């Protein structure tokens, strides 16, 4: 045991730390930079957008939404709009009615797998074999956006689903939710407002640092009393 403490964002790996003799384990999480960008009375530029690198699954997902009449404006590596800076990303989140958060982990939707032999190969070769909460979950609301995220385990530990952010389980549900929230702006804006407040009050990196420094102090005090 060479460390006073270890920090992980994956609560399911805590047991692995214990197996190698690590006693002081801090469960933390990704977060967002602080933001004061305006999110009330916004002039929207996009109905639906996505910011993140292109992947075969994400491309398939966006195309599936397009086949249902839903245009997604995509930004990032290998998308037509290309990369954007952090400042540009902030603005995109705030001027989009519905911000998609599409996972980049291995996907097993049979429709995606059967769409191309390459998709099957990518799945078999993929190293991202489980979905996790990532920084984007917190960045979208912190920067003033309404978030429609793919459900991943433990996301409900940080937001009240359906009241602060909204989650979908597959492309069919995503399409239904997009159409619903585009047609119900008052409900969407209420959820967005609650999500922004939660993210800015509890889920910035300043909050994370303060929390794990408190834990480290507790571990240090306990060891000093031994």
Regions found by a protein language model. Give the residues of each.
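Short, hydrophobic alpha-helical segments
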Residues: 182, 213-224
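Surface-exposed charged/polar residues within alpha-helices that form helix-capping/stabilizing sites
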Residues: 91, 179-180, 197
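Glycosyltransferase donor-binding loop in the core domain
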Residues: 132, 166, 200
């Amino acid at each position: 045991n060479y460390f006073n403490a270890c920090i992980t964002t994956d609560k399911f790996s805590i047991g692995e730390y214990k197996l190698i003799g690590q006693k002081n384990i801090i469960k933390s999480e990704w977060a967002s930079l602080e933001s004061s960008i305006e999110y009330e009375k916004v002039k929207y530029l996009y109905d639906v957008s996505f910011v993140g690198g292109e992947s075969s699954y994400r491309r398939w997902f966006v195309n599936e939404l397009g086949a249902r009449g839903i245009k997604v404006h995509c930004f990032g590596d290998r998308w037509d709009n290309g990369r954007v800076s952090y400042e540009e990303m902030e603005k995109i989140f705030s001027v989009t009615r519905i911000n998609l958060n599409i996972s980049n982990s291995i996907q097993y939707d049979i429709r995606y797998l059967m769409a191309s032999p390459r998709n099957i190969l990518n799945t078999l070769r993929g190293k991202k074999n489980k979905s996790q909460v990532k920084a984007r979950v917190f960045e979208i609301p912190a920067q003033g956006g309404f978030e429609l995220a793919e459900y991943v385990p433990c996301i409900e530990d940080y937001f009240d689903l359906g009241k602060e952010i909204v989650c979908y389980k597959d492309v069919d549900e995503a399409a239904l939710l997009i159409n619903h929230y585009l047609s119900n702006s008052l409900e969407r804006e209420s959820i967005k407002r609650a999500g922004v407040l939660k993210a800015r009050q509890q889920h910035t990196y300043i909050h994370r640092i303060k929390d794990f420094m408190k834990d480290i102090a507790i571990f240090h005090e306990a060891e000093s009393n031994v």
